[in-house]
Amino acid sequence: MAEGEDMQTFTSIMDALVRISTSMKNMEKELLCPVCQEMYKQPLVLPCTHNVCQACAREVLGQQGYIGHGGDPSSEPTSPASTPSTRSPRLSRRTLPKPDRLDRLLKSGFGTYPGRKRGALHPQTILFPCPACQGDVELGERGLSGLFRNLTLERVVERYRQSVSVGGAILCQLCKPPPLEATKGCTECRATFCNECFKLFHPWGTQKAQHEPTLPTLSFRPKGLMCPDHKEEVTHYCKTCQRLVCQLCRVRRTHSGHKITPVLSAYQALKDKLTKSLAYILGNQDTVQTQICELEETIRHTEVSGQQAKEEVSQLVRGLGAVLEEKRASLLQAIEECQQERLSRLSAQIHEHQSLLDGSGLVGYAQEVLKETDQPCFVQAAKQLHNRIARATEALQTFRPAASSSFRHCQLDVGREMKLLTELSFLRVPEAPVIDTQRTFAYDQIFLCWRLPPHSPPAWHYTVEFRRTDVPAQPGPTRWQRREEVRGTSALLENPDTGSVYVLRVRGCNKAGYGEYSEDVHLHTPPAPVLHFFLDGRWGASRERLAISKDQRAVRSIPGLPLLLAAERLLTGCHLSVDVVLGDVAVTQGRSYWACAVDPASYLVKVGVGLESKLQESFQGAPDVISPRYDPDSGHDSGAEDAAVEALPPFAFLTIGMGKILLGSGASSNAGLTGRDGPTASCTVPLPPRLGICLDYERGRVSFLDAVSFRGLLECPLDCSGPVCPAFCFIGGGAVQLQEPVGTKPERKVTIGGFAKLD
């Protein structure tokens, strides 16, 4: 039983040692210089926050052609970037060497930097190629002497060396052989001592007795960081430059306006941040291990996917080779057939010519026929023979080979195919689509249209994402609604919320994966449900002057002789003909919205709404011509001035003329066909591509909007005591086009009065 407990204890100890060893080996990677791949020796902090050994940095600068900026390795340090030399055992303390004369000569102008003329106005900027981030770091004109030593990293390296060293005791440097183990160190003397030697070399009552002993070490560092410019202890930290500064640096013009804080505050802030970050990492070790397992699984999948990709590419290339081989066989077969046909024709021609030789073939037969003396028999045989001889004679006189020996028509032009094969590469994901803002709009539904850039790889399908931007943001990442696998380059989003702002984006997908998202496009939905209706020209419309389209969604006023004949006085021009077109649907409750486009060349068009009864009464029984100052029952009789409460107007129109919107000083100027109180101060605004009309039946208000930006143009009161329907008035030439609904067209609503009530 005791043996089992001992074995368990031994196993736990060994496991702990293995974990410690693994931890130390993993930490060793952080303590290696990126240049020499050995543990840091006197590391310097580069402006990019990476570290490098001073000797390695000096060597790199020498390779770059910078001379006199690395400092003398044997010199005593005059700045934190310089490093003291380690004194050999049993040697007296060396005197301080002189500062680096070469660096002073270069600064004073007696020396020159490589590539810099003597007496140049601007000092040379030294670039150091950082081996960690692979970028050039500016060191300034001071070179390495302007950098700080990373004393903390030195201490970590020293502690690591002591923890992994076996029997690596530090010996006294002043003892006679054999030296004893060192117990103290002295930064001022830069040596390690045993107890006896420390007392011997630091006698009581002398200045050396004031030296503060430290732990024994082989690497002596300055007590603190010193400013490389003023040789003063750094006491502040410049947040703007992200650099430690001394009291003199703090008041210099270089740091004027910078955020400077005491080094204690910077120390505490950075320590708190580092502690919190480290605590978070240590508290989420399970998450780290889970992510490591996920990465390992990703590596396995990568290996499998890579092998599958290789096999797929090999199979496709073999398929191309098979197609090429098949094509090669068919082309060679065609050449072979052409060759055999030509050889056959040439062989037949040779046979014909051989028959023309003396004593053979046709010539020999003709010679024998000429020997015939019986005239009838000769004529019988010579007739056919003569024809053959004539053809042979003609062929002899116009000799030409029966077939050409050239096969130029069998040459292949493989330039295009070679270019395609040369450009054969892996399929790329589609580029970010471009939203077609001219064709994208929001009406009863949202219609989104896009296209791919000219040289983009093809997309098999698209993903459309959308969300509302006018709702409170939920905690966490932004949530998008998606429409997956959209075919084509357009999409419909049904039933959007009214009076909202939607942001939409789209991206393509093919076998290579998903591409980048398009730029976001923001669309405003109508402020109320869209009203679907058709144009009805039976009330107040002249068929001679108004032309309504077959789908009853467009109307055009045609000026001409009928318009002139409709006026009672042709010469004065004080009377004009007004033609009215109404919608076939009336509104009795709720809010409704519709949009239309007015031809900018229209002379005078009024777009709006009115009470159904008042519109029929006014225009069905009104004279054919009216004065521009005539108000067809605006709802105000001659006694309206004495009424306590002014009645609401039965009509509300927006006036458009010659590409401009005519706005009066108030809503009353557009409440009817004309102003009630005569001319008023008015202004004009440009006509937008589409006009929107929003009717609030309960509130008795109608708003005219820019249907593209939904910017308000005019808001008017309206008498909503009965059914209200859309109305369009024309004076002179003009045209109006109702906006087509994005969805399926609704069925026509037909009632006995020509109007359907929308309840």
Curated annotation (Swiss-Prot):
Every COS domain range: 370-427
An example Gene Ontology biological process: neuron migration
Coiled coil: 322-400
GO MF annotation: an example: microtubule binding
Domain B30.2/SPRY span(s) in chain numbering: 526-747
Region spans: Required for proximal axon localization, axon formation and migration: 1-166
Fibronectin type-III domain ranges (all copies): 429-528
Modified sites of kind Phosphoserine: S330, S627
The keyword Metal-binding belongs to this UniProt entry's keyword annotation: yes
Superkingdom: Eukaryota
Any single Gene Ontology cellular-component annotation: axon initial segment
Compartment(s) of residence: Cell projection, Axon; Cytoplasm, Cytoskeleton
Residue ranges, compositional bias (Low complexity): 73-89
Complex formation: Interacts with TUBB3 and TUBA4A.
Family label: Belongs to the TRIM/RBCC family.
Its biological purpose: Microtubule-associated protein that is involved in the formation of parallel microtubule bundles linked by cross-bridges in the proximal axon. Required for the uniform orientation and maintenance of the parallel microtubule fascicles, which are important for efficient cargo delivery and trafficking in axons. Thereby also required for proper axon formation, the establishment of neuronal polarity and proper neuronal migration.
Protein name: Tripartite motif-containing protein 46
Recorded name of the encoding gene: Trim46
